[in-house]
Curated annotation (Swiss-Prot):
<comment type="subunit">
    <text>Component of the ER-mitochondria encounter structure (ERMES) or MDM complex, composed of mmm1, mdm10, mdm12 and mdm34. Associates with the mitochondrial outer membrane sorting assembly machinery SAM(core) complex.</text>
</comment>
<keyword id="KW-1134">Transmembrane beta strand</keyword>
<keyword id="KW-0472">Membrane</keyword>
<dbReference type="GO" id="GO:1990456">
    <property type="term" value="P:mitochondrion-endoplasmic reticulum membrane tethering"/>
</dbReference>
<comment type="similarity">
    <text>Belongs to the MDM10 family.</text>
</comment>
<keyword id="KW-0496">Mitochondrion</keyword>
<feature type="region of interest" description="Disordered">
    <location>
        <begin position="433"/>
        <end position="454"/>
    </location>
</feature>
<dbReference type="Pfam" id="PF12519">
    <property type="entry name" value="MDM10"/>
</dbReference>
<dbReference type="GO" id="GO:0000002">
    <property type="term" value="P:mitochondrial genome maintenance"/>
</dbReference>
<feature type="compositionally biased region" description="Low complexity">
    <location>
        <begin position="433"/>
        <end position="450"/>
    </location>
</feature>
<protein>
    <recommendedName>
        <fullName>Mitochondrial distribution and morphology protein 10</fullName>
    </recommendedName>
</protein>
<dbReference type="GO" id="GO:0045040">
    <property type="term" value="P:protein insertion into mitochondrial outer membrane"/>
</dbReference>
<dbReference type="GO" id="GO:0015914">
    <property type="term" value="P:phospholipid transport"/>
</dbReference>
<dbReference type="GO" id="GO:0032865">
    <property type="term" value="C:ERMES complex"/>
</dbReference>
<keyword id="KW-1000">Mitochondrion outer membrane</keyword>
<keyword id="KW-0812">Transmembrane</keyword>
<dbReference type="InterPro" id="IPR027539">
    <property type="entry name" value="Mdm10"/>
</dbReference>
Length: 472
């Protein structure tokens, strides 16, 4: 489950119409949300608040033997008026990162006289004729800082600013206080990033003061309409290709990876429904009846190859699998996982009885009122947007790998509290991939077992924890 500050940052990106999915770093985000979810290992309590449309605060307290916590503040120049902030009304599907239907990227309108973000609703398609009619607000800027306590404390700071419709700059700072007995300046590292997104192409340029690391990430959406402000509503699928490269002149560190992604778009479901209602002699749609995503990533320097397949079998059920292979060490990894959403039955509120049912029965209007209710209910629940964002009360995630390491996570709403509870189980003799070369899929191994020496005693208990979130 996303933390409250991450949820507010996501709302900021939606308010400024910045597509976070159109990036090479999000190439395998869907599979990672189903296979690499984090299981809490202790008791944590989060208290958060969006006190004004521009300002948010969050406090975290955790304990298992050692009490620690954090204090976070966030400021946005863009008002987040339409962002649900109470934990009792926040849609759970926006906090839980699972399988989600990706929309085709919309190329932004390149108005070089642009000096601000228009303040109209982010869900509307931008028209070049409407830009001059919209109210103009200041350039979108976000400031976020988190202080982790107790000492030695760590400070995380984030700065984001849109400088054009297609460009955004980001600066992240991490500073750690030294030991109390050693008088030294706090260590710090700065990461600067320039993101340029034109819809069809997405490029990111990075620089880190840690070892003077330079980096680049790029993504190309093949066959996307490059017309500014025009959304490709007729495309049923999207094929994306990307790559990333890193180099450090100080440590002579070199990194390189490439990837492909194929995903279905919402138009595939509409095309399937229209083809099924047409004549039997029409050609069937080549796209499957359910949304799915395929990815392929390759790291040539380490010889790592990884493939993922994720599918949503129903609005409340999604599956994902990953296979990783290293051509140098001949080691492999297989991971499978799923998520199951559940909605508790709720009785509809009873209508007020005005005592005139007998008159309606005599006049024959009871059936007409029932037909109106049924048609209104079907029209409100049959839209793709309603199905995509249908609220669930809880979700269960399960993940298992080839060595029978199992993670089980439950996330749901209890009254006005958002609760996350999980357990991690697995044999203590698991050593696969811990001594081999690093691979893009090695992050799926349990953190508690990575690099640990093998033991002859089988220990199946790895961790258990609970996290509670309340926001106002």
């Amino acid at each position: 489950m996303l933390e409250f500050m991450d949820y507010v940052q996501l709302a900021f990106a939606e308010a400024t119409r910045w597509n976070q999915d159109n990036s090479y770093s999000s190439l395998t985000a869907i599979a990672e949300s189903l296979l690499d979810f984090h299981v809490p290992e202790r008791l944590q309590v989060h208290l958060s608040s969006l006190s004004t449309p521009h300002f948010a605060t969050s406090y975290t307290l955790g304990t298992v033997g050692l009490i620690d916590g954090s204090v976070s503040y966030l400021f946005s120049t863009v008002p987040l008026n339409n962002t649900p902030s109470q934990s009792g009304v926040i849609p759970l599907r926006r906090l839980v990162r699972g399988y989600r239907q990706i929309e085709a990227p919309v190329p932004p309108i390149r108005n070089w006289g642009w000096d601000a973000i228009p303040s109209h609703d982010s869900s509307q398609i931008i028209d070049s004729a409407d830009i001059n009619q919209d109210d103009i607000v200041r350039k979108a800027t976000l400031l976020h800082a988190t202080l982790h306590l107790p000492p030695p404390s760590t400070l995380n700071a984030l700065f984001q600013r849109r400088i054009s419709p297609t460009t955004q700059i980001t600066a992240a700072l991490v500073s750690t206080q030294g030991p109390p007995l050693i008088k030294s300046a706090p260590s710090a590292a700065l990461l600067a990033q320039i993101s340029h997104d034109t819809g069809t192409f997405s490029n990111e340029y990075l620089f880190s003061t840690d070892n003077a690391l330079f980096g680049w990430r790029g993504l190309w959406n093949i066959g996307l309409d490059p017309s500014p402000g025009k959304q490709s509503t007729d495309k049923v699928s999207l094929l994306s290709a990307g790559a990333e490269a890193y180099y450090s002149p100080i440590s002579s560190l070199v990194g390189l990876s490439t990837g492909l992604k194929f995903t279905t778009l919402p138009a595939a479901g509409r095309a399937l429904s229209s083809s099924s209602s047409s004549s039997p002699g029409s050609n069937p749609s080549p796209i499957s009846s359910f949304p799915y995503t395929l990815t392929l990533t390759l790291t040539p320097l380490t010889g790592s190859l990884s493939t993922t397949y994720s599918a949503r079998a129903s609005p409340n059920l999604a599956f994902s699998s990953r296979f990783g292979f290293n051509v140098y060490s001949w080691e492999s990894e297989m991971v499978a996982g799923c998520e199951i959403w559940r909605k508790s039955p709720r009785t509809q509120p009873a209508e007020a009885d005005d005592g005139l049912d007998w008159a309606r029965r005599k006049m024959g209007i009871v059936k007409e009122r029932a037909a109106e209710k049924i048609s209104a209910l079907s029209s409100s629940s049959s839209t793709p947007q309603a199905v995509e964002e249908s609220e669930g009360d809880s979700v269960v995630k399960i993940r298992v790998d080839q060595s029978w390491n199992v993670r089980l996570l439950w996330e749901g709403r209890v009254k006005s509290l958002l609760v996350t509870a999980g357990v991690s189980l697995g044999p203590g003799t698991f050593t696969a991939l811990s001594s081999g070369p690093a691979s893009p899929t090695s992050s799926s191994a349990p953190v508690a077992m990575a690099g640990a020496p093998p033991t002859s005693r089988p220990s199946y208990w790895q961790g258990v924890g609970v996290s509670i979130l309340y926001s106002s």
